[in-house]
């Protein structure tokens, strides 16, 4: 009913997009009004407009004031330089991007050309514009292709690629317009916040970005954070042992859905085998038998003991590696290395490693060299990163299905832009078969039929494995074809461009080659245009629509159809068991297609279920990262001040005062009788940090109040600090020492904090049992941890500065070496464990409070 009302409402009043386009049309007419004037200008005069616009900005005009004329200038430049003039719909898209919104434009509508309009306009401010694409190939192609327009108009254009060194990156970021991938952009931001000298930073601020394929960047990839990792000192033997054990363990049957009624009735679920795999949530759990097997293998009494946490963690990792991570689907093995395959694009991601030991577990499984485990040095989610921009716009062919998420998380609305020519592609109903074997045979038959009449075919697969299987089947039939998957993405663009030629057959993994147009030749058009065959429904309707959208660009003919079997993951994991049971009992002859409207709705429901599930995962990730983000902002702000060369003396004197006040408050107060002041305890906690002479009853005989005691100790501490400074011939040398030490302490403590917060997040799930919201609990504890970190930074910084010796030249250095970056899509991230010394309840608390661990931060552990 709600949908009928919505449909009726939009018929009567028009959709949100139609309203917005109506409001933009007067601006479009203004731009078109400049057409003749622009044509009359010489190249030199057209180029001169850039300087004129900059002058007008400096005199108080705004970008909005300049927009109509500036867009007309870019339009004319496009015609002169590339022979491409922006259509009306592209001008609309350009205005929407400048407004910081998302333009939904169908494939082949020239999104790349659209971005030149807002990029030019916003670059006039001189603060830099980032054009974000999904891969290096597109960044390079677009910077060379569209960059010609900007360079013709006198702007500088740069591109940042994965293999570039620091000087090249700095140069590219200093250009007016920079083309770059989302991953490089995020990792450069994190690396900039790890440098020890300001001159080593590469970015110059986050002003305006235009995100191409915005759904892929802000939705698909937002489920996992960007992580920069360094090496931990943990042995790799345990991974190999756990892999041996995992291969001896027996997988139990999947547990049926556990309903609320079962829980109320207290019905226990029967487990068998040593472990159970939940493919839906990508989780592995041990059964009672499995726990016993692990205990006997490692000769331990109780796997649940805290000291056996590492064994438990590694056994689960080995089981995940062997049961949930599939070769040639999630990763490939090449030259003795495990390379991650991006599950959205099907591309190999060199240099990426799964975090939390999963990569090592896969290395052990595949019998290649197990590399040292990594620990997290810096991380951020795409949500929090892109929200740091002053303004952001995005383009994609498919965004409306996720409009709610764009609004809620990024504050961006989606405006659907009409196509330049109507879409005439024929989208056929899904062809459903009982088994995968029958389905693949039907796909090959469909390819043969189309190929016989010269119709080009693009077969979209979800995994490398399936693309290779179909390739073998087509070869057996003698059909010449190209395969496009993660293994060959160097040839990607060339193969995609050829995919529209008469008689061409192309198999592509997922959305490999997205961003490159498939152009039809005349014979292909006559044969019915590009035929798209999807070999499986994707988790997301949006990605299915992207595959369909490869055909029928700019009013071309074409058709699309998905082939599905009841054995596909989507149907197996999320389809209704009852429905599948019905079709199995119908006794459909082998190889025959099943058609039923119940099936279509089951497929759509399954996809909606997964989409809302994935939205929940992203929202949950963001809620946790928001807490981390507050800490991250404070730490990065502090680092920036140090790097900028500000004097830190006032801040350090403030730290000294804070510590003295804190230590005195632990042992004395104005309300207490002076005889009750615990001076022994004060010496014990204060002197290791500030090396004053011991405080005795005689030395404080004149003092009556604890506030006076604080003042006296502060006076002495400052005098001692000034004396330390005088040991250095040049005060500026000591200022640099302060910066070096503060930087080193901040970095080390922040690294520990990231890993501690990670562990906290893993353990916090258990709090839900106590009827408390895990995120609220996480917030409360993390604020305490942050206070403890700040106290610890103050203690360590002061302690080191009072004890520094002049003969040793102190240099800034990174506290840990970066060994890699990571994009882990296999599961929710686990804790990144540090092999630090174990703290026992009666040990002094490492926060420096002087209390026993059990009475201080141990309370929260």
Describe these PLM feature segments.
Residues 35, 432, 624, 739, ...:
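Generic anion/oxyanion-binding catalytic loop in active/binding sites
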Residues 115, 443, 830-832, 840:
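Active-site-adjacent structural elements in folded domains
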């Amino acid at each position: 009913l709600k949908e009928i009302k919505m449909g009726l409402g939009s018929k009567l009043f028009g959709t949100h997009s139609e309203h917005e386009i109506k409001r933009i049309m007067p601006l479009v007419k203004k731009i078109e009004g400049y057409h003749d004037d622009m044509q009359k200008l010489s190249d030199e005069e057209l180029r001169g407009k850039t300087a004129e616009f900059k002058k007008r900005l400096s005199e108080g005009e705004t970008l909005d004031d300049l927009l109509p004329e500036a867009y007309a200038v870019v339009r004319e430049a496009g015609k002169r330089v590339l022979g491409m003039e922006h259509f009306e719909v592209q001008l609309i898209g350009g205005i929407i991007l400048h407004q910081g919104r998302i333009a939904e434009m169908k494939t082949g509508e020239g999104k790349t050309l659209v971005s030149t309009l807002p990029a030019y306009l916003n670059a006039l401010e001189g603060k830099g514009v980032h054009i974000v694409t999904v891969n290096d190939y597109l960044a390079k192609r677009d910077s060379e292709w569209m960059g010609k327009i900007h360079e013709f108009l006198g702007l500088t254009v740069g591109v940042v690629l994965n293999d570039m060194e620091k000087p090249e990156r700095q140069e590219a970021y200093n250009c007016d317009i920079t083309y770059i991938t989302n991953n490089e952009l995020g990792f450069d931001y994190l690396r900039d916040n790890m440098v020890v000298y300001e001159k080593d930073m590469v970015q110059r601020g986050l002003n305006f970005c235009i995100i191409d394929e915005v759904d892929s960047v802000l939705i698909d990839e937002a489920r996992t954070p960007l992580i920069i990792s360094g090496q931990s000192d943990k042995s790799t033997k345990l991974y190999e042992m756990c892999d041996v054990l995992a291969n001896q363990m027996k997988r139990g049957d999947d547990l049926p859905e556990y309903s609320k009624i079962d829980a109320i009735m207290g019905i226990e679920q029967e487990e068998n085998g040593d472990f159970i795999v939940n493919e839906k949530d990508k989780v592995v759990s041990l059964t009672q038998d499995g726990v016993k097997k692990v205990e006997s293998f490692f000769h331990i009494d109780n796997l649940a003991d805290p000291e056996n946490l590492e064994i438990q963690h590694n056994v689960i990792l080995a089981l995940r590696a062997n049961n949930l991570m599939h070769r040639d689907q999630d990763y490939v093995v090449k030259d003795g290395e495990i390379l991650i395959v991006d599950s959205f694009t099907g591309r190999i991601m060199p240099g990426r490693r799964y975090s939390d030991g999963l990569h090592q577990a896969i290395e052990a499984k595949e019998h290649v060299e197990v590399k040292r485990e990594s620990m997290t040095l810096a991380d951020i989610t795409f949500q929090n990163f892109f929200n740091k921009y002053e303004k952001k716009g995005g383009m994609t062919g498919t965004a409306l299905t996720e409009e709610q998420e764009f609004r809620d998380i990024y504050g961006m609305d989606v405006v659907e832009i009409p196509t330049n020519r109507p879409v005439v592609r024929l989208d056929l109903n899904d062809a459903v078969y009982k088994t995968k074997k029958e389905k693949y045979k039907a796909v090959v038959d469909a390819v043969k039929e189309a190929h016989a009449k010269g119709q080009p075919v693009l077969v979209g697969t979800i995994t490398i494995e399936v693309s290779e299987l179909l390739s073998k089947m087509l070869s057996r039939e003698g059909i010449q074809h190209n395969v496009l998957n993660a293994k060959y993405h160097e040839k990607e663009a060339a193969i995609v461009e050829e995919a529209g030629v008469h008689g061409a057959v192309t198999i592509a993994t997922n959305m490999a080659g997205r961003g490159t147009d498939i152009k039809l030749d005349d014979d292909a058009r006559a044969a019915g245009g590009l035929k798209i065959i999807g070999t499986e429904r994707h988790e997301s309707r949006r990605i299915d629509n992207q595959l369909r959208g490869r055909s029928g660009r700019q009013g071309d003919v074409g058709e699309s159809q998905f082939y599905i079997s009841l054995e596909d993951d989507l149907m197996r994991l999320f389809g209704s068991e009852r429905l599948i049971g019905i079709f199995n009992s119908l006794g459909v002859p082998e190889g025959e297609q099943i058609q039923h409207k119940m099936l279509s709705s089951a497929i759509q429901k399954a996809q909606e279920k997964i989409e809302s599930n994935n939205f929940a995962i992203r929202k949950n990730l963001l809620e946790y990262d928001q807490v981390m983000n507050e800490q991250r902002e404070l730490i990065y702000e502090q680092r920036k001040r140090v790097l900028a060369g500000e004097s830190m003396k006032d801040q350090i004197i403030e730290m000294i005062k804070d510590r003295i006040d804190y230590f005195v408050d632990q042992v004395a107060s104005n309300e207490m009788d002076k005889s009750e002041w615990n001076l022994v305890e004060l010496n014990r906690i204060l002197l290791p940090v500030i090396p004053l002479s011991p405080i005795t009853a005689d030395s404080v005989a004149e003092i009556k109040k604890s506030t006076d005691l604080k003042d006296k100790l502060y006076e002495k501490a400052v005098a001692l600090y000034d004396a330390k400074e005088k040991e250095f011939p040049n005060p500026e040398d000591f200022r640099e020492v302060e910066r070096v030490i503060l930087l080193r302490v901040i970095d080390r403590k922040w690294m520990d904090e990231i890993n501690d917060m990670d562990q906290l997040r893993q353990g916090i799930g258990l709090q839900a049992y106590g009827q408390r919201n895990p995120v609220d609990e996480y917030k409360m504890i993390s604020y305490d941890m942050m206070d403890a970190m700040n106290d610890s930074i103050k203690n360590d910084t002061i302690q080191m500065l009072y004890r520094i010796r002049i003969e040793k030249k102190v240099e800034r250095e990174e506290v840990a070496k970066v060994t890699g970056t990571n994009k882990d899509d296999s599961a929710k991230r686990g804790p990144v464990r540090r092999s630090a010394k174990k703290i026992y309840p009666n040990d002094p608390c490492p926060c420096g409070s002087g209390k026993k661990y059990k009475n201080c931060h141990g309370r929260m552990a």
